[in-house]
Amino acid sequence: MMVEFAPLNTPLARCLQTAAVLQWVLSFLLLVQVCIGIMVMLVLYNYWFLYIPYLVWFYYDWRTPEQGGRRWNWVQSWPVWKYFKEYFPICLVKTQDLDPGHNYIFGFHPHGIFVPGAFGNFCTKYSDFKKLFPGFTSYLHVAKIWFCFPLFREYLMSNGPVSVSKESLSHVLSKDGGGNVSIIVLGGAKEALEAHPGTFTLCIRQRKGFVKMALTHGASLVPVFSFGENDLYKQINNPKGSWLRTIQDAMYDSMGVALPLIYARGIFQHYFGIMPYRKLIYTVVGRPIPVQQTLNPTSEQIEELHQTYLEELKKLFNEHKGKYGIPEHETLVFK
């Protein structure tokens, strides 16, 4: 089969969109290694006047990702994020108003690959978040390990993400006056191994820590489903029990890292590459579940609220799936 390349007269806007998403994908795949390499080179070539002050700062600043982070508005306002959002494009949908006098936990589903819906909607100034939810500040919680890499952590925090640790969640949810939203991708990295186009498998049955945090702080729970998130990449088939899945599960269990073998389109052609497909992403924010603050919740209370959350998440999916091209017979699978 002959590979057809993109025409030379491709509109400039589409070229800029492709470039924006390419840098974002490469930041996931390579930026950590580049940042580590820079630090190693500074040490090897004895640029002590650069690396020693930074390492002192690194030590001093270690807990910042657990204390609200350090977002920079000018970074969140970079034009690159406008083109990033338009590539798919990414849309935020509100189903109900939220009270800015309260704090909330948004449970984001599914994880998919690279989670562009969560980043595009909650970490850039080009999102409709502020328009749809005035008076709110969003905090996207990501794995703590991302903040362990020098230099990379500064770039990551500048876009708004914070740690997903208990301390970080408590810091956000205990802020007086309300108007704070903690966004947690509840399926975690392991759910990326389930991210096949047209599938809706969520790793959530054993994820109950967020429920305990909601009860402890009296934060309302809000299910969020991002339609189209799993359709951006294809993944080499990895059913449970296969040699590939066995290796992937072993890597996750030992290192906490999930490595799905993915492919989609290329930069200049549509047949194969690391670029995600241009698929619409509709991130739908559901109805809030009121939570009464309980400083020492029992396991029964946690289980009851967890079950309520699963039911509301399933309702959200079923109510909106038809609008976004999902057949009526499809349903969520909880693992």
UniProtKB/Swiss-Prot annotation:
Positions annotated with a glycan in the UniProt record: N180
Localization per record: Endoplasmic reticulum membrane
Gene Ontology cellular-component annotations: endoplasmic reticulum; endoplasmic reticulum membrane; membrane
Membrane topology: Multi-pass membrane protein
Enzyme class per UniProt: transferase
Recorded catalytic activity of this chain's protein: a 2-acylglycerol + an acyl-CoA = a 1,2-diacylglycerol + CoA; 2-(9Z-octadecenoyl)-glycerol + butanoyl-CoA = 1-butanoyl-2-(9Z-octadecenoyl)-glycerol + CoA; 2-(9Z-octadecenoyl)-glycerol + octanoyl-CoA = 1-octanoyl-2-(9Z-octadecenoyl)-glycerol + CoA; 2-(9Z-octadecenoyl)-glycerol + dodecanoyl-CoA = 1-dodecanoyl-2-(9Z-octadecenoyl)-glycerol + CoA
EC number: 2.3.1.22
Family from the record: Belongs to the diacylglycerol acyltransferase family.
Name used for this protein in its record: 2-acylglycerol O-acyltransferase 1
Protein source organism: Mus musculus
